[in-house]
Amino acid sequence: YLQSAIRSVAFSRLWAMPQVEGYDTIVIYGDREHFSNVDYFTGYDARWEETLLILPRHGRPSILVGNEGIGYVKKVAVDIEVEFFQTFSLMGQPSDRSPRLKEILERRVVYDGGKIGVIGFKAYDASNHTVGGFITDVPHYMIETLCQVVPRDSLENATLLMADCRYGLKHCVSAKEIVIFEAAGTRISRGVLNCLRHLKPGMRE
């Protein structure tokens, strides 16, 4: 219930933002340490793998998952199409049953002459760096593959759509979401308190 209540409006909320004007598709990268942006829309935790969430303005969203994720993603409570991309798995695991990244992106990324937003971990001020143009922390091979599908100059770091303190989706919550977060936090803290109150010398896990 918590997942569906929060995320049922996440996609429409994104595309209703004035800051997404001109974007054809938003591509969101996540991994073990940085999956909150993907989680915001889907509830999916990449665990020890990587993941890529593709959100076209027109069309169904899709998510790329690895060997472990192909089973875990079934628990996602939103309507989303799943692409099996084994390169996102841990090293040494099978990688012979999924298409190449370019083939997937050609099917999933919608480009109508607008911008392609790329969301990674951080937004970057170009004035602080000696590299020009598009700056992102999304893995290089993914960006280069994306550039085989859409023009390089269409890419734009769109991380502020999630993280900007003034308008970022993760910083602007509804009254309903506040209630849900408070209820979840209270339930967890009570569970911890209950555990501590019942600890006794000599107890084992």
Task: Cite the ranges covered by each PLM segment.
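A composition/biophysics-driven feature that prefers long, compositionally simple stretches
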Residues: 1-190
